[in-house]
Design a protein with these regions (language model features):
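Generic structural signal for well-ordered, non-transmembrane alpha-helical segments
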Residues: 27, 50-58, 62, 106-113, ...
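Conserved alpha-helical segments that form or flank metal/cofactor-binding pockets of metalloenzymes
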Residues: 43-80
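Preference for long, well-ordered alpha-helical segments
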Residues: 108-137
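The feature marks the first
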Residues: 1-43
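Hydrophobic alpha-helical segments
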Residues: 4-8, 66-79, 85, 137
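Acidic/His metal-coordination segments adjacent to aromatic residues that form catalytic metal sites
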Residues: 1-18, 81-106
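Alpha-helical scaffold segments that form or flank carboxylate-/histidine-based iron centers
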Residues: 11-19, 43-58, 100-101, 126-136
Length: 137
């Protein structure tokens, strides 16, 4: 991920803070996606949630976690995974409905793009900037 010349350069405090914060929020959001998947009734929505979990947020989590590990930094805590439940087992008054889930996902995707743009703007290391550029797309 980091090339040899940039790997020798230390991270500045903003890069460390934002890498660590991004990893923490991604770990928390992965658990949120598990909960929302339990609440979703529409199969297309469940498939979409599975896709962004497996192909969107999980690879981002792994890449940022590897950067922090390789830098010798302590990783943020991860909340425990949630068990799979059937949507019918969730009381109607406690259940998110499908339009609410879709709106929550839309909001998170937009916020993620803004955060990635901000991190790209403050990064000194080109490889980190490029990584968040990939996350942005």
């Amino acid at each position: 991920m980091l090339n040899q010349s940039q790997q020798a350069e230390p991270f500045h405090s903003g890069e460390i803070f934002h890498l660590w914060s991004f990893l923490l929020s991604t770990k928390e959001y992965l658990v949120t996606l598990q909960v929302l998947n339990n609440h979703a009734g529409d199969q297309d929505l469940k498939d979409f949630l599975d896709d962004i979990y497996e192909n969107g947020y999980t690879p981002e989590e792994e890449q940022v976690e590897n950067i922090l590990k390789n830098a010798g930094l302590r990783l943020p805590p991860a909340p425990p995974d949630r068990p799979n439940v059937e949507v019918e087992d969730i009381p109607a008054g406690a259940r998110f409905n499908d339009p609410e889930i879709a709106n929550l996902i839309q909001r998170e995707l937009m916020v993620s793009k803004m955060i990635c743009s901000y991190i790209m703007g403050i990064c000194v290391q080109e490889d980190i900037k490029n990584l968040f550029g990939e996350f942005h797309t």
